[in-house]
Design a protein with these regions (language model features):
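Conserved, mostly hydrophobic/aromatic
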Residues: 3, 14, 75, 134, ...
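Alpha-helix-loop-beta-strand connector modules within alpha/beta enzyme cores
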Residues: 22-51, 107-114, 167-175, 222-232, ...
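C-terminal helical cap(s) of enzyme catalytic domains, especially alpha/beta-barrels
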Residues: 87-98, 214-237
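Mid-to-C-terminal alpha-helical segments outside catalytic/metal-binding sites
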Residues: 226, 230-264
């Protein structure tokens, strides 16, 4: 609710298992997910729900079942595969090297479920090639329109770099909405500011950073959204209400279906 009051018009939601000691694992229990989303919608009238869908492997039945139950306005669509890697300080692997696999067949299943329920796909782009792939998905007819999320800061993906951001805009479809997800510490904030200046939507949350622009640790999503809203104002833009954001993203009327939350503060 603090994030909503600070200007967040979109809530990106991850669902977690509720059993003791299992809270770091995702849950695709439709009953649980519906309960969470209903509580968010009740507390934050008009807010736009953006559902996570990421799974490793070919089985997408879990996220698809949740899409069909909660009917989010937006659903993430991981638009390409990535070697998901990170090193510790001693240069050993932070976790066993893995592939976040998103072949076209898997993407198509997700897009079909989104089309069936009226959810708008948000294409998660981890590198330049994935941005270009999204353009091909649209040209091929896999999805009607592109909404890009440039994910920067994954250790084996695109770095948080304002110059790279400017290049990416030359590869997306003209006129298509876009935003950045920036992962890191206080070094991400100048790129949030550049996103605002270049006309992108602004997004942050404890999923991506624990730090405010001055390096202080954030006590919650609310203060992060306050800082993000200031980036919009610094760029001469206003913070969009949920109704404004629906119009900007052409989402239509509010959806209703039947725990980490990341928040987007759209600006106009």
């Amino acid at each position: 609710r603090e994030a909503f009051d600070a200007g967040a018009s979109v809530m990106h939601v991850h669902f977690r298992m509720q059993d003791e000691g299992m809270g770091h694992f995702p849950s695709w229990d439709p009953d649980l997910c519906e309960e969470v989303v209903d509580a968010i919608r009740a507390s934050c009238p008009g807010v736009i729900i953006n559902q996570t869908t990421g799974v490793v492997g070919p089985d997408v039945s879990g996220p698809i079942a949740v899409i069909k139950r909660i009917r989010p306005e937006i659903a993430a669509c991981n638009a390409g595969s990535l070697n998901y890697l990170k090193l510790k300080k001693d240069k050993s692997w932070a976790w066993p090297p893995m592939v976040f696999d998103n072949p076209v067949e898997k993407i198509q299943k997700m897009l079909d479920a989104m089309d069936e329920t009226g959810a708008h796909p948000e294409f998660e782009c981890f590198d330049v090639g994935i941005v270009r792939s999204v353009n091909m998905y649209i040209e091929n007819g896999m999805a009607p329109a592109a909404h890009y999320n440039f994910v920067m800061g994954v250790a084996s993906g695109m770095p948080v770099d304002a110059k790279l951001l400017e290049l990416l805009l030359g590869y997306k479809r003209e006129g298509a909405p876009w935003q950045t997800t920036l992962i890191g510490r206080q070094e991400i904030w100048p790129v949030h500011q550049r996103t605002a200046e270049l006309g992108g939507m602004l997004r942050t949350g404890l999923e991506d950073t624990f730090y405010l622009p001055d390096g202080e640790r954030a006590g919650g999503n609310g203060v992060l959204i306050e800082a993000l809203a200031q980036c919009a104002r610094n760029a001469g833009r206003d913070v969009a209400s949920p109704a404004d954001a629906r119009a900007i993203m052409q989402l239509g009327e509010e959806q209703h279906g039947s725990d980490g939350v990341e928040n987007t503060s759209a600006a106009r």
